[in-house]
C-alpha cells in the first residue's frame, strides 16, 4: 500500500532524526474517537502538531491522511512514522488489542472511557469484566492513567488489576458521584 510502505532497513533510517513522541492511548466502549479529536484540538491550540488514528481516519495536524477504521496497530504505526507528528493520539480498539496486542510498548498516558455490553463472544470475551480487563491493558504500559471511576465494572476491575500488580496504584480517580 503506497500510504503505508514496509518498514525501512536499518541503513535507510535517518537515526539522528529519530526521537520519542509523547503518546496517549485512548480506549473504551464509547467515546474513543471523540476523545482523540478533543485532545488533538487541545494540542493544536498549544501549537503542537498532533497525529491521531481512530475508527474514522488518520489525521496529521489538519491533514486527513486516510479514511476508514485505523484504530489498530496499523493506524498507530502510520501516525508514529509521520515526521510531522509532535504528539500521538492513538485510539486503541478492543479487537486490535485482542488480535495483535498493543501497538506500542510504552505510552505517556492512557485513557479508558467506559465499558459496555458489546462484542460478547468475540476473541474469548464473554462478559463486562472481560471487556474491562481488555481495555485496562493500556494501563500496563502508561506512565499516567485516566480511568472513568463512575463506570462501576471498570472501577472494580481496575482495583483487581492493581491488587495483582498489573497496574500501578492510581491515586487520583475522578468520581463525581461521591
Regions picked out by a protein language model, each given a short descriptive name:
Residues 101, 124, 158-162, 169-172:
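Alpha-helical transmembrane segments and their juxtamembrane interfaces
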Residues 64-66, 161, 165-166:
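Active-site regions of enzymes building and remodeling cell-envelope glycoconjugates
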Residues 1, 124-132, 144, 166-169, ...:
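Adenine nucleotide phosphate-binding catalytic loops in nucleotide-utilizing enzymes
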Residues 11-64:
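Walker A (P-loop) phosphate-binding motif
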Residues 109-113, 165-171:
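Short hydrophobic/aromatic-enriched beta-strand-loop microsegments
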Residues 1-13, 84:
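N-terminal leader/targeting and accessory segments in enzymes
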Residues 151-153, 160-163, 172-177:
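Alpha-helix boundary/capping motif
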Residues 64-149, 154-155:
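Flexible active-site lid/hinge loop adjacent to a nucleotide/diphosphate
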Amino acid at each position: 500500500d503506497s500510504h503505508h510502505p514496509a518498514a525501512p532497513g536499518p541503513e535507510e533510517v535517518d537515526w539522528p532524526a529519530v526521537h520519542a513522541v509523547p503518546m496517549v492511548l485512548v480506549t473504551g466502549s464509547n467515546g474513543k474517537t471523540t476523545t482523540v479529536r478533543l485532545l488533538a484540538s487541545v494540542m493544536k491550540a498549544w501549537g503542537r502538531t498532533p497525529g491521531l488514528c481512530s475508527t474514522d481516519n488518520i489525521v496529521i495536524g489538519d491533514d486527513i491522511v486516510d479514511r476508514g477504521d485505523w484504530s489498530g496497530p496499523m493506524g498507530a504505526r502510520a501516525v508514529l512514522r509521520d515526521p510531522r507528528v509532535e504528539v500521538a493520539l492513538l485510539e486503541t480498539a478492543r479487537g486490535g488489542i485482542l488480535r495483535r496486542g498493543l501497538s506500542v510498548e510504552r505510552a505517556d498516558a492512557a485513557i479508558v472511557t467506559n465499558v459496555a455490553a458489546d462484542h460478547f463472544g468475540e476473541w474469548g470475551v464473554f462478559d463486562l469484566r472481560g471487556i474491562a480487563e481488555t481495555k485496562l491493558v493500556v494501563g500496563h504500559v502508561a506512565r499516567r492513567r485516566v480511568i472513568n471511576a463512575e463506570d462501576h465494572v471498570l472501577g472494580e476491575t481496575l482495583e483487581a488489576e492493581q491488587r495483582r500488580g498489573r497496574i500501578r496504584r492510581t491515586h487520583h480517580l475522578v468520581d463525581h458521584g461521591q
